[in-house]
UniProtKB/Swiss-Prot annotation:
Topological category with respect to the lipid bilayer: Multi-pass membrane protein
A single cellular component GO annotation: plasma membrane
Name the record gives this protein: Uncharacterized protein aq_917
Coiled-coil segments on the chain, per record: none
Organism: Aquifex aeolicus (strain VF5)
Keyword S-adenosyl-L-methionine carried by entry: no
Compartments in which it is found: Cell membrane
Domain of life: Bacteria
Ranges annotated as spanning the membrane: 15-37, 50-72, 87-104, 111-130, 145-167, 180-202, 236-258, 270-289, 304-326, 347-369, 374-393
Keywords, comma-separated and alphabetical: Cell membrane, Membrane, Transmembrane, Transmembrane helix
Length: 408
């Protein structure tokens, strides 16, 4: 076990997280291209646009990260991970493409996308849950993964009902299903998983004090319990207020811990965490009023997710490149800070901030400008992460390792 309590004995192949992260960033660029296309055509399709981001970008990133974190952080070993990851990766990618196209054109090809997503996502979420539930005495981070995966599974099932409802196969209350699906996916899955991961990585990577136990131990289970209550009490608005309050407290404590870090050097990733937590707080303020401020809520939550994933990818890829090369005994392995130079991270941070400020152009109905700025930022993001992955490939090939065939 080391560093930071990581179990390196079960380190899965680097290609798993690399393919999920690269795919996620390709989808991120497709999202902004899609928004740009809609802006020039003076149209806007909310549902397909949202799902390019939530499935293509968010889910690809988080599932790829969990393939890495379950065995290393929780000791929950997934046997033959490369084959399982390939199956999930193909299903998620094809499912997202078919679903988004079907929703955009109101074509029943969306059902094919739903099929691919169901078999891949329900398979991996149930497998990961099973592996985590078998382990006793888990630390707070992997214990939180359980509740996040439970919410993810619930969100997938609710999404199935929504698609079937949309195409007339069943007749259920769409507003009720939609609100539950959104709540489970955004707060039960995404925000809870981000929080759970941060319980591990904030202290380890940024040398901060640990999170208070009342947050790290109780946040995931409390949020999950509130969401289950929401299923039976959909009109009890205080549930949304409590969920918002919990994540607001979490965000403030995250900022507080980062301000108390031992290394007081400027770091673009810490700046991204500050931006992310700021938008999480804004999202929490808007969540109880989302019916009247829905687009503001979605944008703020999207900025929270985009900022935190940028911060995590820029730390995870260099760390894993260094870790894998070091454990393989590759000579002259680069340090974490050589894999992706910090100057490039700062450049991407500034592009990201400019993109966020460009959202003000929406007020003046200049709808093409924000996706243009975000596309430039996300292309640079993809370039940097790809270069980081290629550092690993180059060093492995140079060392002529027998495991080269497992890299790509």
């Amino acid at each position: 076990m080391s560093p930071g309590g990581l179990n390196l004995l079960y380190l899965p192949p680097f290609s798993i997280i690399a393919r999920f992260f690269i795919t996620a960033l390709i989808f991120l660029n497709l999202e902004f291209l899609f928004l740009l296309y809609q802006a020039f055509n003076k149209e806007f399709y909310l549902t397909p646009s949202v799902h390019v981001f939530t499935l293509g970008f968010m889910a690809s990133t988080m599932i790829g990260a969990l393939f890495q974190m379950l065995p290393v952080v929780a000791g929950a070993v997934i046997e033959d991970p490369l084959k399982k990851a390939t199956f999930v990766h193909i299903g998620l990618t094809l499912g997202t493409l078919f679903l988004v196209y079907g929703l955009y054109s109101f074509n029943k090809v969306a059902l094919l996308g739903l099929f691919f997503l169901l078999i891949s996502l329900l398979y991996i979420s149930s497998l990961m849950l099973y592996k985590l539930l078998r382990i006793k005495n888990l630390r707070d981070a992997p214990r939180g993964f359980r509740f996040a995966l439970g919410s993810f599974t619930a969100g997938i099932i609710l999404a199935t009902f929504l698609v079937l409802n949309l195409f007339g196969f069943i007749n259920l209350n769409h507003k009720y299903l939609f609100d539950l699906h959104m709540s489970f996916m955004l707060f039960g899955w995404t925000a809870t998983l981000v929080a759970s991961v941060s319980f591990q990585v904030i202290e380890m990577f940024f040398v901060t004090p640990p999170y208070p136990k009342f947050i790290s131990s109780y946040l995931p289970k409390t949020v999950f319990t509130l969401l289950v209550l929401k299923v039976f009490l959909p009109n009890f608005s205080l549930i949304d207020v409590f969920i918002s309050l919990i994540f607001t407290i979490y965000a403030f404590f995250t900022i507080k811990l980062l301000l108390r870090r031992k290394r007081k050097i400027k770091d673009p990733l810490i700046s991204l965490w500050y931006v992310s937590m700021t938008f999480l707080i804004i999202s929490c303020v808007l969540f109880p009023f989302r019916e009247n401020l829905f687009y503001l809520f979605l944008i703020s939550f999207g900025m929270f997710v985009l900022s935190v994933i940028m911060a995590m990818m820029y730390r995870i890829i260099p760390f894993l490149v260094w870790m894998h090369l070091s454990t393989k005994g590759v000579p002259k392995a680069p340090t974490m800070f050589e894999v992706i130079p910090q100057k490039k991270m700062w450049n991407n941070f500034y592009l990201h901030i400019i993109s966020i400020f460009s959202l003000i152009f929406l007020i003046f109905k200049l709808y093409f400008l924000p996706p243009t700025f975000f596309l430039i930022s996300s292309l640079y993001f993809l370039y940097n992460i790809s270069k980081g992955v290629l550092v690993y490939v180059k060093h492995i090939k140079r060392a002529q390792s027998p495991s080269t065939s497992n890299i790509v």
